[in-house]
Design a protein with these regions (language model features):
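Buried hydrophobic core signal strongest for RNase H-like alpha/beta domains in large
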Residues: 1-382
Length: 382
């Protein structure tokens, strides 16, 4: 954090804060009575790393489910458009417009509400291994879990999911590795399972899209969109301020504009309102065609196989941008809805994006999560 001191001298300092979430006493949130089974499964799974072939199999397996979600997104863009007027559409209650079923979602309702406790902020630099160790000790002091008896109980019985940004997660994994040969389960940090926060991952995804598709004011990228929409301050990705919020809004606006124009192109309609004459089933069919022909890897590959004299590089760029915009919107909606299975389906493609985009840090985070989900975690920890 930065702030002004007397004499107008700028001063930089570091601090750490944390929030404790306690799940309700419900079967869906039950962790094992002891962490012995969890530790054994982790140790066994670590000996069998997930392979590239297995990751690609997960990617292929998830593709049909992601396609269904993308079709629904494109369909909702149409019916939610002001020109369509869903509330007065004859078939507004059609099941075609309902959200596709998902296999795994977080339970909702008052019975599943989490208790939340904000801890005191401390002047500790969490960016270092030493700082993370200091913070662990301070946190357990605040929670009154720093007695020998409580430490023993934590080491043998408790499993604590520790979520943070990429740097925090990386430091905690490194700290666990450094202390893996210590004497007790508590000192070895066997009770702690670090996991990255999805909000930070989503910000990295948005930054990756900005870097890849910024382009020029004369092209089809974001630079031209910013100019047309009158967006200011989005030219370079920033961590501070409201850049992410403003850029995410622009992503949604650009995606909506792209796909509404495709609706008109593929149906031959002169306006969005004209599509009210179509049945829900017809609209759903058109949405499938839009995703397949204008926003899929298959469409991109088909374009790339054309003879050099027939290739349309501009069309290829638009198809790729549309595909990646849908992927971002899918991740955003899955997180907001608590649809865990949809988030998990996106992990392989997120890995490919971060690895290909030279974001090695989040590529490692995705690899770690895939390894834990498919090799190391017990079912109740998942």
């Amino acid at each position: 954090m930065s702030h002004q001191r007397a004499g107008h001298n700028s001063h930089f300092d570091s601090g750490t804060a944390a929030t404790v979430f306690i799940p309700p006493d419900e079967p869906d949130y039950k962790l094992p009575e002891t962490n012995e089974e969890f530790v054994k499964k982790m140790a066994k799974g670590a000996k069998t790393p997930i392979t590239p072939h297995e990751i690609q199999e997960l990617h292929v397996d998830a593709a049909p489910r992601i396609f269904v979600q993308n079709v629904h997104t494109v369909l909702r863009m149409l019916v939610n458009a002001s020109g369509f007027g869903l509330k007065t559409y004859e078939h507004q209650d059609s099941p075609v417009f309902e959200h596709p079923l998902v296999s795994e979602a977080l339970p909702t309702g008052l019975a599943y509400a989490l208790d939340q406790f904000i801890l005191h902020t401390c002047k500790i630099d969490e960016s270092t291994y030493d700082g993370n160790e200091q913070w662990l000790n301070e946190l357990f002091r605040q929670l009154r879990l720093d007695t020998d008896e409580e430490k023993e109980k934590t080491g043998q019985e408790r499993t604590i999911i520790w979520s943070g940004d990429q740097l925090t997660t990386s430091r905690l994994r490194g700290l666990k590795a450094l202390r893996s040969m210590d004497d007790t389960p508590y000192e070895q940090l066997c009770w702690m399972e670090p996991i990255f926060g999805w909000f930070h991952l989503q910000m990295s995804f948005a930054t990756s899209l900005h870097k890849q598709y910024y382009g020029t004011k004369a092209g089809v990228g974001f630079a031209r969109a910013f100019e047309l929409l009158g967006k200011k301050g989005l030219g370079s990705a920033k961590v501070k301020g409201n850049w992410f919020h403003d850029f995410e809004e622009t992503l949604e606006e650009v995606a909506t504009a792209h796909f509404l124009s495709i609706w008109l192109e593929i149906t031959g309609a002169s306006s969005i309102q004209d599509l009210r004459s179509k049945s829900p089933e017809e609209l759903h069919h058109f949405a499938e065609c839009i995703v397949l022909e204008f926003a899929s890897t298959a469409a991109l590959e088909e374009e790339s196989r054309r003879p050099p004299t027939e290739r349309d590089e501009l069309q290829e760029q638009i198809i790729q941008l549309n595909r990646d915009l849908l992927e971002y919107l899918e991740l955003d909606n899955a997180i907001k809805q608590g649809h865990v299975s949809r988030m998990e389906d996106l992990l392989p493609s997120l890995l490919y994006r971060f690895q290909g985009g030279n974001n090695k840090l989040y590529a490692i985070e995705i690899m770690e999560l895939l390894q834990k989900l498919h090799k190391e975690w017990t079912d109740n920890v998942k």
